[in-house]
Amino acid sequence: MTKTVPPKTPAYEDTVGCQIALFEWAESYDTKDWGRLAKCIAPTLRIDYRNVIGKLWEAMPADEFLAMASSEKFLGNARIKTQHFVGAGKLVQTHEDRITGYHQMRVAHQRYSDDALTEVLYTGHGHGKATVQFCLVDGVWKFAGLEPEIRWAENDLEKIFE
């Protein structure tokens, strides 16, 4: 049973654990390393993409999240390159095994016209914040949810995933 605690700053070790999970998530997205992504995510995730594609999943199983992220219609498309740059952030511990992170984000995107990645078709960059959920699973902090908030975008962000 999860014990509720008043929101507080997490202990140093817990903060580092969440930073590791966040780094692994971002790097796995950008390198398209789906095995690496599988290792850093929780068994169930809360994915709130209402701000991006109008959808919310309160409890998405890890295998469905992996399938969505690696889909040809999303980040699995070899012609799409990204960099998920995480800026300043703060962490709040809401339960003994739950932490919420609030992070500045800039996500750069390029879509290429060919498989050899010789010609950039579109570029688009999103700027804003991500609310990230973390949960403790067998003593390891895992990426457990995401809610991006795009405050503004550059270039043709809306065309990247067409």
Curated annotation (Swiss-Prot):
<feature type="active site">
    <location>
        <position position="84"/>
    </location>
</feature>
<comment type="pathway">
    <text>Secondary metabolite biosynthesis.</text>
</comment>
<feature type="binding site">
    <location>
        <position position="29"/>
    </location>
    <ligand>
        <name>substrate</name>
    </ligand>
</feature>
<comment type="similarity">
    <text>Belongs to the scytalone dehydratase family.</text>
</comment>
<dbReference type="Pfam" id="PF02982">
    <property type="entry name" value="Scytalone_dh"/>
</dbReference>
<feature type="binding site">
    <location>
        <position position="49"/>
    </location>
    <ligand>
        <name>substrate</name>
    </ligand>
</feature>
<dbReference type="InterPro" id="IPR004235">
    <property type="entry name" value="Scytalone_dehydratase"/>
</dbReference>
<comment type="function">
    <text>Scytalone dehydratase-like protein; part of the gene cluster that mediates the biosynthesis of the tetrahydroxanthone dimer neosartorin, which exhibits antibacterial activity. The two different monomeric units appear to be synthesized by the same set of enzymes, among which the Baeyer-Villiger monooxygenase nsrF is the key enzyme for the divergence of the biosynthetic routes. The pathway begins with the synthesis of atrochrysone thioester by the polyketide synthase nsrB.</text>
</comment>
<protein>
    <recommendedName>
        <fullName>Scytalone dehydratase-like protein nsrI</fullName>
        <ecNumber>4.2.1.-</ecNumber>
    </recommendedName>
</protein>
<dbReference type="InterPro" id="IPR049884">
    <property type="entry name" value="Scytalone_dh"/>
</dbReference>
<dbReference type="InterPro" id="IPR032710">
    <property type="entry name" value="NTF2-like_dom_sf"/>
</dbReference>
<dbReference type="GO" id="GO:0006582">
    <property type="term" value="P:melanin metabolic process"/>
</dbReference>
<dbReference type="GO" id="GO:0030411">
    <property type="term" value="F:scytalone dehydratase activity"/>
</dbReference>
<keyword id="KW-0456">Lyase</keyword>
<feature type="active site">
    <location>
        <position position="109"/>
    </location>
</feature>
